Amino acid sequence: MPIETKRINQVEFLTAGGISVPHGFTTRYGGVSTGTQASLNLAYGRGDTMENVVENLRRLGSALGFDPEKLVMTRQTHSDIVRVVTDRDCRGFCHKDYPECDALVTNTPEVTLLVFTADCTPMLFFDPVTGAVGAAHAGWRGTAQKIGAKTVKAMVENFGCKPENIRSAIGPNIGLCHFETDEDVPQAMLAAYGEEVRQFIEKRGDKYHLDLKAINAMSLNRVGVTQIEISDACTYCQCDRFWSHRASHGERGSQGAVITCKEVGR
């Protein structure tokens, strides 16, 4: 099933047909922030006011059907750290100081997970058998460290999930067209994944372009996840719709990838 765009009360987000719990990859549309954060900025610490971010999170919760007070967020450092969380980790959506990690997993009903992006690759995970969910943020370093696969591993080890049951969605990121790097990035991918990854690397002059969505999908396939939906949106190409760190030279807000755990059968 394809990734689809939805708009509820002016809040625009992308959803995956295979994930049946509340979830979405947000866009810039539907919030109250202004300037470079206009308008649905979800991240603190980027020059926006706390009041704006809180209202944006309220609006997102209303659109997707989750309680913002039961959010758990990430403090992202391009690591491979995956945190297992419960309702005890919900600190309220006004709280800015969460422990360092780049992925979250839970099987606690009504807990909502949120990771932030603005070119990096967002991934969401859902197991309809156990009800467990996950969310991951993968920059090129996280991709090389296989954070998507490690998120799956955390779901398997902590919640008894089977990879073949897990449904995953890969959201908008900076595409092959604009993710230009020096040689260190493809070398990191080759060290992590071997020769198979070369098909997702293009040399253009003295620079390299990489397809990070495809590399992350390959990584998930290797650990047994085959139900993967992939957005074709590039944050750089569509920087009027998504925040792109590169296109905006760092003057930006952040969109989010969000998913809520629900009791199995409800």
Segments and roles (model prediction):
Residues 1-266:
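Active-site microenvironment for binding and transforming phosphate-containing groups
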